[in-house]
C-alpha cells in the first residue's frame, strides 16, 4: 500500500477539481516530504478506508460527488463527477496494484484498459484485419448512454474475479445509490441520485465499466464464431469456443471495444445475423444498440449485396473508429480529409471565440480574471493539441496541408490575443519554441514533426495490435505493402528511423 499510495499522490494532477469539502491534492502533497513517522498515520487511514474499517459517515462523505455538465456534441450532455481527493487518491493506488490483473481479465480486445494508445491500436487492428480479410463487414455499434446505464452489480461481480480487494472497496460507493450535488446557480443547487451507471470522473471508472461490458462482449464473440462455424459446416468446438483471439474458421470474426465503442467484424454473408445477434446480446445486458447511429463498411463487399438492415447504416467512405478514420487505402482518403477539415474548422471557430473573450467585456467571466493569460493557456494546452491525435494516426502526406492551415490559425489567434500585428521570421520561430527554451509554446506541425508523430504512435501500439489480431506491425519499408502498412500501405519507415 505504501509504495502505490506514495506514487498516487506524487503523480496526482495539479489544479484538478476540489471535492465538496474544498480539499485538493495540493493539500496532501506535503506528505511526500514527511518522515516515516508522519506518513504512517495517513497510510493507516488509507488502509482502513480501503478495507471498509471506518464509520459509516466517513463512507457517506467519500461517496458524495460534485456533478458538472459538460457539452457533448451539439445537443448532448456528458455528466462528470468530482469526488473527494482522498477517495481519488486511494482508488488510483489500488488500481496501480491490480492493473495487470484487470487487463488480463478483460482481454486484449478491450483496448481501454492497460493499453497505451488504445484508440489508435483499435483503429489499426480494424485496418489490418480489413486488408487481410477484404470481404469482412465491419460494424461500429453505438450503445445508447452506455456508461450511465451499465449495471453496477454486473460490473462489480466481474471485477471481483480479477481484483477482489478493489471490488470490495468500490462496493462501498457503488453498492448503494449515489448522490451528487449539482449547482444551478451561485446560491442554488439540487441533488441528483443515481442507482445504476459508472461515474465518469472516477479513477476506477474505465476498468469497472470494461469489466461490466466483458460478459456481453464475450457472449457476442462466441455467438459470432458459432454462426460462422455452422454456416461453413464446421462442428462447434465446445472446449475452445470461449477462447480469445481469431476464430478457427476460414474467415475471421472479431469483436473489439474501447469501453462502449464496439467494433464487430464478420464475413459478409453473416452480416445481418451478426447485427441482430449484437442487438440481442447487448439488450440482455441492459444496453441498447442505436441502429441510426451505428454504421457498417467493408473493403470489397458491395452495399447492394447486403440485406436492408445493413444497407441503411452503410458508410461508403469508411468508419471512424475512436474518431480515427479507417478506410480503403487504395482510394481517395475522403473520410480522413473530411475529418481533418472538420477539426480545422472547429479550431478556427474556437480560436475566434478566444479572441472575442479578450476584446468583449460582456464575455468576461469575472472582473478580476486575467483574460489574456487565461485565453493563452486554453489556446496552448487545449486548442493547439487537437491536431496531434490525428497526426499520430493518419498518413502525414494527407495531414500536411491541413497542418499548415492549423498552424496559421494558432499563430494568428495568438498574435491577436497579445495584440501584435506583424512578426518577422525570427519571431515566428520563437512562437514555435517550447516555453522552457524561451519560446511561446505554439507547436509547429512541420513535415518532419508529422512523420515523427506518425511513426512513434505506430511503434507504441504495435504490441496491442499483435495481441488482438495476431498480425505484426514492422517498421520496415520491405513490409510497406504487406502487413506493416500501418495506416498508409505505401508509407516507408526507413528514412524516418533516423529522425
Explain the meaning of each model-derived region:
Residues 1-216, 226, 452:
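Conserved pre-catalytic core of RNA-dependent polymerases
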Residues 2-13, 306-317, 419-436:
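Short acidic, Pro/Gly- and aromatic-enriched capping/linker segments at domain boundaries
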Residues 39-52, 122-130, 271-286, 340-353:
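Inter-domain linker/hinge segments that demarcate the starts of reverse transcriptase
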Residues 46, 402-414:
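Short amphipathic alpha-helical coiled-coil/interface segments
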Residues 104-117, 225-237, 291-292, 396-405:
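Short, glycine/acidic-rich hinge or "gate" loops at secondary-structure transitions
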Residues 178, 183-184, 194-196, 256-258, ...:
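A conserved non-catalytic segment of reverse transcriptases
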Amino acid at each position: 500500500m505504501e509504495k502505490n499510495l506514495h506514487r498516487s499522490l506524487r503523480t496526482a494532477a495539479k489544479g484538478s477539481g476540489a471535492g465538496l469539502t474544498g480539499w485538493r491534492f495540493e493539500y496532501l502533497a506535503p506528505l511526500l516530504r514527511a518522515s516515516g513517522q508522519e506518513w504512517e498515520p495517513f497510510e493507516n487511514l488509507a488502509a482502513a478506508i480501503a478495507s471498509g474499517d471506518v464509520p459509516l459517515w466517513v463512507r457517506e462523505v467519500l461517496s458524495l460527488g460534485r456533478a458538472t455538465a459538460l457539452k457533448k456534441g451539439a445537443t448532448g450532455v456528458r455528466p462528470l463527477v468530482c469526488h473527494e481527493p482522498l477517495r481519488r487518491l486511494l482508488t488510483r493506488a489500488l488500481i496501480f496494484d491490480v492493473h495487470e490483473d484487470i487487463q488480463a481479465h478483460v482481454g486484449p480486445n478491450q483496448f481501454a484498459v492497460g493499453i497505451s494508445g488504445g484508440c489508435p491500436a483499435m483503429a489499426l487492428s480494424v485496418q489490418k484485419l480489413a486488408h487481410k480479410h477484404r470481404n469482412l463487414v465491419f460494424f461500429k455499434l453505438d450503445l445508447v448512454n452506455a456508461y450511465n446505464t451499465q449495471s453496477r452489480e454486473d460490473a462489480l461481480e466481474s471485477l471481483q474475479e480479477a481484483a477482489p480487494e478493489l471490488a470490495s472497496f468500490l462496493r462501498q460507493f457503488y453498492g448503494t445509490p449515489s448522490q451528487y450535488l449539482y449547482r444551478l446557480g451561485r446560491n442554488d443547487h439540487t441533488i441528483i441520485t443515481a442507482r445504476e451507471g459508472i461515474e465518469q470522473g472516477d479513477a476506477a471508472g474505465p476498468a469497472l465499466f470494461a469489466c461490466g461490458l466483458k460478459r456481453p462482449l464475450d457472449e457476442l464473440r462466441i455467438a459470432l464464431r458459432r454462426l460462422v462455424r455452422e454456416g461453413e459446416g464446421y462442428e462447434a468446438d465446445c472446449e475452445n469456443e470461449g477462447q480469445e483471439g481469431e476464430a478457427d474458421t476460414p474467415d475471421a470474426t472479431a469483436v473489439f471495444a474501447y469501453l462502449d465503442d464496439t467494433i464487430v467484424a464478420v464475413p459478409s454473408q453473416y452480416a445481418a445475423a451478426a447485427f441482430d445477434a449484437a442487438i440481442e446480446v447487448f439488450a440482455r445486458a441492459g444496453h441498447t444498440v442505436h441502429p441510426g447511429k451505428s454504421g457498417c463498411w467493408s473493403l470489397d463487399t458491395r452495399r447492394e449485396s447486403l440485406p436492408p438492415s445493413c444497407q441503411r447504416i452503410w458508410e461508403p467512405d469508411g468508419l471512424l473508429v475512436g474518431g480515427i478514420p479507417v478506410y480503403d487505402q487504395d482510394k481517395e482518403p475522403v473520410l480522413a480529409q473530411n475529418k481533418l477539415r472538420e477539426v480545422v474548422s472547429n479550431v478556427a471557430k474556437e480560436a475566434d471565440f478566444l479572441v472575442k473573450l479578450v476584446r468583449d467585456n460582456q464575455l468576461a467571466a469575472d472582473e478580476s480574471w486575467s483574460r489574456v493569460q487565461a485565453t493563452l493557456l486554453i489556446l496552448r494546452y487545449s486548442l493547439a493539441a487537437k491536431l496531434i491525435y490525428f497526426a499520430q494516426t493518419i498518413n502525414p502526406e494527407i495531414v500536411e496541408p491541413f497542418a499548415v492551415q492549423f498552424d496559421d490559425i494558432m499563430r494568428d489567434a495568438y498574435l491577436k490575443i497579445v495584440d501584435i500585428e506583424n512578426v518577422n521570421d525570427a519571431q515566428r520561430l520563437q512562437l514555435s519554441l517550447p516555453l522552457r527554451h524561451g519560446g511561446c509554446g505554439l507547436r509547429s506541425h512541420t513535415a518532419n514533426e508529422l512523420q515523427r508523430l506518425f511513426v512513434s504512435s505506430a511503434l507504441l501500439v504495435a504490441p496491442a495490435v499483435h495481441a488482438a489480431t495476431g498480425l505484426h506491425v514492422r517498421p520496415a519499408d520491405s513490409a510497406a505493402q504487406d502487413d506493416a502498412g500501418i495506416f498508409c500501405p505505401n508509407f516507408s519507415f526507413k528514412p524516418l528511423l533516423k529522425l
